[in-house]
Design a protein with these regions (language model features):
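FIC/Doc superfamily catalytic core
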Residues: 1-200
Length: 200
């Protein structure tokens, strides 16, 4: 779903905001449906990622999801993008900022965190920071959610997105950029579940 404001967007067809794609779909509504159809299949090809998690891990997830549709899948974007009042990380800083965050993440011991509230706040902080990176031209949220599912599985937790309203998720992402991770943490409190609780 191409809803970004972009400067000099070579990812799109000339005089259009529709992303260039392998099926040569020029209509945004049809492309949105194609994305849903394709990713509903390709998501099942993604194997569980293992530590250490890096930018390459996220790129691989994105590639698996979208390479059927986009030639640039798994590649860090080289243009500036924004959505609403949110301006995402400038291309020149994406790799260095991603490396900084992944290095910090590697030092966390969420499997040793007994306080579920504290865990959810920590996860929310990282999620919001990674979300600001938005390293790809499209498909950032879908790839990032899968990455965090894998990270949390290794820490002994499962993420259940069931019952999560799209409007609440969007509001938490916007708040994560504008004011902090509190709204995201409040959502995660209900959707991050210890595996031992889910499977006694």
């Amino acid at each position: 779903m191409n809803r970004y404001r972009v400067w000099r967007d070579h990812y799109c067809y000339p005089d259009s905001d529709v992303l260039i794609n392998r099926y040569d779909i020029r209509d945004q509504t049809l492309l949105d449906q194609a994305e849903r159809d394709v990713t509903a299949l390709t998501i099942h090809t993604i194997r569980l990622s293992h530590p250490p998690f890096t930018l390459n891990t996220l790129c691989h997830i994105h590639y698996c999801l979208f390479s059927e549709l986009y030639s640039w899948a798994g590649q860090v974007r080289d243009i500036s993008i924004s959505k609403g009042q949110t301006r995402f990380c400038q291309p020149a800083f994406i790799i260095s900022e991603a490396n900084r965050l992944f290095e910090k993440l590697a030092g966390e011991r969420w499997n040793e965190q007994p306080d579920h509230n504290a865990l959810c706040h920590q996860v929310a902080w990282y999620y919001c920071e990674f979300n600001v990176l938005h390293p790809f031209r499209e498909g950032n949220g879908r790839a990032l959610r899968i990455l965090f599912e894998h990270i949390l599985l290794h820490a002994g937790y499962q993420v259940s997105w069931r019952g999560l309203k799209a409007s609440d998720w969007l509001a938490a992402n916007i708040a994560g950029y504008q004011s902090g991770p509190e709204k995201m943490a409040a959502l995660f409190l209900h959707h991050i579940i210890p595996i031992s609780d889910k499977n006694p």
